Amino acid sequence: QASRCMDCGVPFCHWACPLGNRPPEFQDAMYKGKWKEAYEILTGTNDFPEFTGRICPALCEKSCVLKLSMDAPVTIREDEAAIIEAAFREGYVQPRQYERNGKSVAVIGSGPAGLAAANQLNRRGYAVTVFEKLEYVGGLLRFGIPNFKLSKSVIDRRVAVMEAEGITFKVNADIDVTNLPEGFDAYCICTGTPQARDLNIPGRELKGIHFAVEMLAQQNRVLAGQHIPEEERI
């Protein structure tokens, strides 16, 4: 697939990516067998390719010239996943230690935004503590996405790297704006949007009607081994 990338003069895939990923560059390195170089290019713009390589809506592929011309885009998302998995397998992904600047930041929320903010702040020398209100780190990555799309072991693997780099995670932390933890120089609020939007439609009040996120969160807990009483099961 990487060989199909044409390194377009006007790279629509690059423009379409909210992260500013550079598919032509990392796919060229991948095609040439330069996996470490591909990994370095990819992670230059993307903190967590193992997540996006599995669950991203792949706007890059929708903008690929081969998609527009013959409805057969380069499988950029799968190539991302292949690169990062090769990087873990070959040992390219190693915890790094950064020079500290003496400042500390509390990141509230451990979903995609919180993890990315923590990762970037840590790289810039801040002492980072991530607070998560639920019992596991990951936010909607963990509770809103089924295992067949994103195995929770993938999340745990990345969190382990971040912990080894000096980031602290605290779960079951019930925090609001009137109860921020003390002792930090700054706060980064990354609470996401977990509140579902209700619909005022006929039948909404019927038994057995639930928000999708409620069902997904409960099922992910069941798969993690938690016991849910029969009367509470969705």
Which residue ranges define each predicted feature?
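A ubiquitous short alpha-helical element
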Residues: D7-F12, N46, K149-K152
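Residues forming the flavin
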Residues: Q1, E80-I234
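Proline-rich intrinsically disordered, low-complexity coils
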Residues: P11, P23-P24, P49, P57, ...
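Iron-sulfur cluster-binding cysteine motifs and their immediate structural context
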Residues: D7-K32, G53-I83, T129, K133-Y136, ...
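General structural signal for alpha-helix termini and helix-helix connectors
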Residues: R4-D7, G44, F48, K62-L66, ...
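Ferredoxin-type iron-sulfur electron-transfer modules in oxidoreductases and energy-metabolism complexes
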Residues: Q1-A2, N21-R54, M70-Q97, Q219-N220
